[in-house]
Amino acid sequence: MRAFAVAIISIGLSAGLTDVQAQSWQPSRPITMVVPLSAGGSTDVIARIMAPGMSKVLGQTIVVENVGGAGGTIAGARVAHATPDGYTFAIGQWGTNVATGAIYSLSYDLMKDFEPIGLIATQPFLIVARKSMPADNLTQLIAWLRANDNKATAGNSGVGSPSHIASVLLQKAVGVNLVMVPYRGAGETTQALVGEQIDITLNTPAISLGQMSAGQIKVYAVTSKQRLAIAPNIPTTDEAGLPDYYFSFWHAFWAPKGTPKAIVDKLNNALVQTLSEPATRTKLVDLAQEIFPREEQSPKALRIYQQSEIDKWWPIIKAANVKSE
């Protein structure tokens, strides 16, 4: 990961909170962390890893609430229109806070209607298939997909999700048309794969490695340039026969637009302190997460990074003709 040049961004105070009140803000009731996807996926898992540490720093309970549906846009609208007082913020990721803007007609603006809090970590996917898939390596899987053009099914976590866009790019790289099957999150997609209701999916190491060890699925490659430290036996896509196919996605926190800078800074401090805890770092690394360096965990760095990702990916997504329905 690279360091990002950042610009100073002034953030106005929300109505009803003075400078002094914001500076001295100490939460007096539970804080809600909105998760824009269903339980069981990597976004939910990361949220539940981060919440206890941030609660400790802030001195108040953080309640994790899953608000799934429509690629995360239901949760996005809720947080965008929430009272900007520090008691509601969201975890999001590349799909919910980049890709959705190129696919859905949103009631909010991804860059203008949120205050960035900070980046957390990034991770690759694993290319996985149902247990009964008659392919023992990625080359054989690609041959099977080509032989089953327009019939092979690819599950994903919802339209515009990282797994959906990664599947769209996979079919382009392989030269086939996959039947896309959207679910309400990675948890449901995983259940469908284990239940052999779909042929393949792209899923996170955090979810897939357990099923691989239990013999419930087949794993073919990791979508990164390097092998995973926690699973060095899994080849990269380059090594497995699909050169130049890479995909990773990241997670971060956002607050509603107008949340006072002093409160955003306190939430960011809770993020930074939690990510500095060895126990938290170990849990994330064990899930194949690459934690962003300290200098890239600031609100300003997230704003710059998110905009750069929008500039990079929107043309690709639109060119792929990805639709919300």
Regions found by a protein language model. Give the residues of each.
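Short coil/turn segments
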Residues: 40, 94-95, 130-135, 156-161, ...
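Periplasmic-binding protein-like
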Residues: 120-126, 221-257, 294
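N-terminal (or domain-start) structured segment
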Residues: 22-113, 151, 175-204, 211, ...
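An extracytoplasmic/periplasmic, membrane-proximal ligand-sensing/linker region
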Residues: 28-30, 261-325
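Beta->alpha turn/N-cap motifs
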Residues: 91-96, 156, 186, 203-208, ...
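Bacterial N-terminal signal peptides
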Residues: 5-16
